A protein has these predicted regions:
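Short alpha-helix
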Residues: 224-250
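A conserved beta-strand element that flanks and buttresses the S-adenosyl-L-methionine
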Residues: 168-169
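Rossmann-like AdoMet
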Residues: 5-99, 103-146, 151, 156-158
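Short "lid" loop at the C-terminus of a central beta-strand within the Rossmann-like core
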Residues: 149, 175, 203-208
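Core SAM-dependent methyltransferase catalytic element
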Residues: 258-288
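A short, conserved alpha-helix within the catalytic core of class I
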Residues: 176-188
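Short, glycine-/aromatic-enriched active-site segment of Class I SAM-dependent methyltransferases
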Residues: 208-224
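Conserved beta-strand signature within the Rossmann-like core of class I S-adenosyl-L-methionine
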Residues: 192-205
């Protein structure tokens, strides 16, 4: 939706002094916290020592999110899937470029790099300024400060990496955006990157209507809420002939022991398939 201008209030103290202009960017701190929490568990599903390190340096108090079990487990399941997809792409493709859109303070490069391919981190300029303090760019892990809805960076990547194959990861971001903007983004990608893979997560329109049920979203008041939902898995195919649905994975079917009582949410029709992770491919023949 519209850009939410930064305003300080009681619920925002976690990000005081970081200068994020858009409230959505604050959720970068939340995912960082959940990954740090996971790293300290003996039965951890992912390991992210960099998240622990950055949180310590920031010195922000995230304790009000300590018991947000559903959000924490969901974040880790999502991170694990996108890490796994990134590793597969880097291993299997000849000249891969993986672009992390709205990367926040996530260091997927550290978790997944095996010495081959390029991973590009992109987020809004104010977020990237903060990111640089903790995660400096490198030749195989460059950074771009831009809106994902612009096309300049897309053309720049095509110029910088000719003969490469691209994958785009959009983690934990689309549900906060405007549907028309997302459609434009997917169309712009489809027309420029034939053969690319798109990996993203989405919530249903039922979840959008009930976003205050989300245990972490509640903490942010009205500045952060779900605005875009996807119901039909193939709905996005209608946006461009090059877009093809490949697969879906549902959160709630995984790591049942970690969800605890929350598995009962499967009984609520809107919840069972309310949160999902998808892969779309851009057909090889697609061209502007």
């Amino acid at each position: 939706g519209k850009e939410i201008v930064w305003t300080m209030n009681e619920s925002k103290k976690a990000s005081a002094g970081l200068g994020f202009k858009v409230s959505i960017s604050e959720t970068a701190l939340l995912t960082l916290y959940f990954k740090a929490q996971e790293t300290q568990r003996p039965d951890r599903l992912i390991e992210d020592p960099r998240a622990v390190e950055i949180l310590e340096k920031l010195g922000v108090d995230m304790s009000r999110f300590r018991d947000k079990k559903m959000s924490q487990v969901g974040t880790i399941i999502r991170t694990r899937r996108f890490d796994r997809e990134t590793r597969r792409i880097l291993a299997d493709w000849e000249r891969p470029v993986v672009v992390h859109l709205a990367c926040g303070l996530d260091d997927r490069f550290l978790r997944t790099d095996a010495g081959k391919g390029v991973q590009v981190d992109l987020d809004l300029p104010d977020v990237m300024e903060v990111r640089k303090r903790f995660l400096p760019p490198s030749e195989r892990n460059p950074q771009i400060g831009a809106s994902m809805f612009e096309t300049g960076w897309m053309d720049e990547l095509l110029e910088r990496y000719p003969e490469h194959r691209f994958a785009f990861i959009m983690e934990g971001v689309l549900m906060y955006l405007n549907g028309a903007d997302i459609k434009g983004l997917f169309q712009n990608l489809a027309r420029r990157f034939p053969g690319a893979e798109l990996h993203f997560d989405a919530v249903s329109t039922w979840m959008v209507r009930h976003s205050k049920m989300h245990d972490s979203i509640r903490e942010y008041g009205d500045d952060v809420r779900f605005t875009w939902g996807l119901d039909g898995l193939r709905d996005i195919e209608a946006w461009d002939p090059g877009l093809k649905f490949v697969e879906v994975e549902y959160y709630i079917n995984q790591e049942l022991r970690r969800w605890g009582w929350a598995v009962l949410l499967n009984l609520i029709p809107g919840m069972a398939k309310g949160s999902k992770m998808l892969r779309y491919d851009i057909r090889q023949t697609n061209k502007i």
